[in-house]
């Protein structure tokens, strides 16, 4: 599980009191939340990504990288070696698509995508929401950089083969 933490304590309390989580739909998530509220109280209060192993919630890994300094929409690759995520729009109207190599803790910028003018002029938010395909070679994103909202499929097969040779 990947967790973005700003101020986790309040969020954990809110989630623990949510009757939806009381059902046995997400027992692993509830286990981590309960464990976290007791054991991570003062450990994850920074703007960073954290990995929590559902089988060993006490094993908390903070992803230390200057490019992973804001909330996004992360997803772990099918082989569990990479994380794809996006950033929110910066002051110039660009969002980044980022690939984290979990083995080397290195981040690659796959691309930067400009928010469509009509969205920025109306102060509307828009995110890339990157998702892996089953092979781990393709990324699907939502983007407005061509002037309208569209879905795009990006092949990262060549980048992955270069990373694996390093």
What are the roles of these predicted feature ranges?
Residues 49, 53-102:
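C-terminal structural cap/anchor segments
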Residues 10-18, 44-51, 92-98, 147-155:
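Structural motif
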Residues 17-27, 46-64, 99-112, 158-162:
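Surface-exposed loop/turn elements that mediate protein-protein interactions on large endomembrane-trafficking
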Residues 124-166:
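Blade-level signature of beta-propeller repeat domains, shared across WD40, Kelch, NHL, RCC1
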Residues 61-75, 105-132:
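Conserved blade-ending motifs and adjacent loop-strand segments that build the rim/top face
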Residues 3-10, 36-43, 84-91, 140-146:
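Beta-strand C-termini and the immediately following turn/loop, strongest in propeller blades
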Residues 8-45:
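Membrane-proximal basic amphipathic "stem/tether" segments
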Residues 1-4, 73-83, 90, 129-138:
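Blade-terminus and WD-like Trp-Asp/Gly-His loop motifs, strongest in beta-propeller folds
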């Amino acid at each position: 599980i990947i967790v973005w933490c700003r101020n986790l304590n309040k969020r954990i309390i809110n989630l623990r009191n949510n009757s939806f989580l009381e059902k046995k739909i997400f027992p692993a998530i509830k286990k981590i939340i309960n464990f976290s509220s007791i054991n991570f109280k003062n450990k994850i209060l920074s703007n960073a990504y954290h990995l929590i192993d559902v089988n060993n919630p006490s094993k908390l890994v903070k992803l230390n990288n200057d490019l992973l300094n804001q909330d996004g929409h992360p997803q772990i690759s099918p082989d569990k070696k990479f994380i794809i995520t996006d950033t929110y729009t910066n002051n110039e109207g660009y969002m980044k698509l980022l690939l984290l190599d979990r083995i080397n803790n290195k981040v690659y910028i796959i691309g930067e995508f400009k928010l469509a003018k009509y969205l920025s002029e109306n102060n509307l938010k828009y995110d890339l929401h990157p998702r892996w395909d089953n092979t781990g070679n393709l990324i699907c994103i939502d983007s407005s950089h061509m002037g309208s909202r569209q879905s795009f499929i990006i092949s990262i097969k060549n980048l992955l083969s270069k990373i694996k040779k390093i």
